[in-house]
Amino acid sequence: MQTSVTPDAISTVLSNPSFDSSSDRSEIVVQVVDLKPIGNRYTFSANDGKTKVKAMFTASLTPEIISGKIQNLGLIRLIDFTVNDISSKSTKYFLVTKCEAVGSVLDSEINLDSKSGEEEAREPKKQKLEHSPVSPLNDVVSTGITLKPKQEFVAKSASQIMSEQRGNAAPAARMAMTRRVHPLVSLNPYQGNWTIKVRVTNKGVMRNYKNARGEGCVFNVELTDEEGTQIQATMFNDAARKFFDRFQLGKVYYISRGSLKLANKQFKTVQNDYEMTLNENSEVEEASSEEMFIPETKFNFVPIEELGLYVNQKELIDLIGVVQSVSPTMSIRRRTDNEMIPKRDITLADESRKTVVVSLWNDLATGIGQELLDMADQSPVIAIKSLKVGDFQGVSLSTISRSNVVINPESPEAKKLKSWFDSEGKEISMSSIGSGMSPSAKNGSRSLYTDRVLLSHITSNPSLFEEKPVFFSTRAYISFIKPDQTMWYQACKTCNKKVTEALDSGYWCEGCQRKYEECSLRYIMAVKVTDSSGETWISSFNDEAEKILGCSADELNKLKSEEGEVNEYQTKLKEATWSSHVFRVSVTQNEYNGEKRQRVTVKGVAPLDFAAETRLLLQDISNKNKTSQ
């Protein structure tokens, strides 16, 4: 049976910023001091004889306390716990998720820093009696550990404890203490009476709407409880106006008298099957005295190299990265109402050696965006909550009304990323995640990771493409490039439109309405592609053809005109065959001499990225497993 604490255990843990209880298996035995209930949990002070730190047991350990296995002044061995920061204070606390009682309850609090027996003997008797009302012999033990006198303990009923807590609590908290605090994970639409204690980890803007039922306003907040569970709460009209100013980002509240329903996946911003609605009769009270035990904003970071999987999806993502550059603010005219709105682009990088452009809009562009511009030379780390992934330049990110930006967050991910960048990242050449993906345009092009199909899906469904162009991505081999086809056309160097030879000399451009002495050649090439399901001919224009052949049309024309034993022109075409690419294509139907023909046109092409393809296959397997279950 353990009879002593681990000396200096707490100071050792607090001095190690990267401490991980799951990997550091050194034994840590502390004494439980000042054990008291907070909602459905218990807080205490962990004492190692020299240092004390605030701590909390998770709800899973509450039965151990109720059964008496863990008691006040008892000794416990910490098996699994985390060290968290207390909001708005420069102190920390332990969140204990697993422990075991290792000794019987001691008479008093352990104090290794107390005076020795000889020093204490010199103290006046009156002072000694004041500090030792029970027995002087209990003050000093042979090990040098001094025990503070055991406090008088009187058994109290639950109603007495709750009554005392309500009497000492601030008026704002008394409402919440009349009911049991429920964890978010336990809520469902069929409960009618609950109280939750949550932190506002994200707050949206007040938005006005107009529909067939009338006009109104709405705003929402993201709430997080002690377990780290999140839920989105939405308020309309009177409730929105009532609670918009009351809810402050980062503060903790008791909330009751709300309702739950299944979350709309189209608008869901957190990982929860339910969403909450608060009306004007809901109760919201601030719980400022206990905010330290509610975690800050919870992020689920996506590495930059994996962003392609989220392009044009409804799911919002969180991102962390090192700031590489910050642009000045620019004004963009919104199409819906012609209003000018501010925008600022920042470029972020992470350990995948990839970069991505994030567009900050509205207040984020002028507020935090300006802060980032002022400190860009310091390469700060930023974490962004709720980003929309688009396909501009392959992959692009944009903030929305509920997005939240944190500069230099105090998190393990941020510290690790900053350490990597300072030690090696700033010397490494980065590449854009969008390179190798087709740019966005009005023709409907998207990321090469979306709408992936086999060639047979395109060739065997001609009726799908009768009304308008349909876009797909496909992975295929180039099997043949016909050498005697018309490979290019003569183009204007200014506008790229077709030119005709002038009567005297030079070239005439209808687009520019002027004559030029020279022109350039631009590809208009047909290639046959093949995969495991079939084959088809596709049309490729200049930019995509250059990627396929590895040279410009002018360079290929020069090879074609050269004479020699080896036909360099045909050799160049053969080199491009039987290489695998990912194509973004549009499929349309054209009518020629009364016959409908399918036309497949390349909109984007990229070499095979084996890492990205592997992730895509794993995602497909995961989706199929979920469907079959």
From Swiss-Prot:
- Pfam families attached here? DUF223, Rep-A_N, Rep_fac-A_C, REPA_OB_2
User: Per the record's keyword annotation, is rRNA processing included, yes or no?
Assistant: no
Which GO-annotated molecular functions does the record name?
ATP binding; DNA binding; helicase activity; hydrolase activity; zinc ion binding
Q: Which GO terms describe its biological process?
A: DNA recombination; DNA repair; DNA replication
Q: Which residues bind DNA?
A: 194-280
> What's the superkingdom here?
Eukaryota
The annotated regions of Basic and acidic residues compositional bias extend over 115-131
- Where is the protein found, in the record's own terms? Nucleus
Q: Where is this region: Disordered?
A: 112-135
Q: InterPro entries in the record, alphabetically?
A: Euk_RPA1_DBD_C, NA-bd_OB-fold, Rep_factor-A_C, Rep_factor-A_N, REPA_OB_2, Rfa1, RFA1B/D_OB_1st
Does this UniProt record's set of keywords contain Nucleotide-binding?
A: yes
The alphabetical list of record keywords is: ATP-binding, DNA damage, DNA recombination, DNA repair, DNA replication, DNA-binding, Helicase, Hydrolase, Metal-binding, Nucleotide-binding, Nucleus, Zinc, Zinc-finger
Q: Where are the zinc fingers (C4-type)?
A: 492-512
What Gene Ontology terms describe where this protein resides (cellular component)? Answer: nucleus
Sorted alphabetically, which CDD domains does this protein's record hold? RPA1_DBD_A, RPA1_DBD_B, RPA1_DBD_C, RPA1N
Function field: Component of the replication protein A complex (RPA) required for DNA recombination, repair and replication. The activity of RPA is mediated by single-stranded DNA binding and protein interactions. Probably involved in repair of double-strand DNA breaks (DSBs) induced by genotoxic stresses.
The record's note on quaternary structure and interaction partners says: Heterotrimer of RPA1, RPA2 and RPA3 (canonical replication protein A complex).
State the PANTHER family in the record: OS03G0429900 PROTEIN (PTHR47165:SF4)
Family the UniProt entry places it in:
Belongs to the replication factor A protein 1 family.
Q: What is this protein called?
A: Replication protein A 70 kDa DNA-binding subunit D
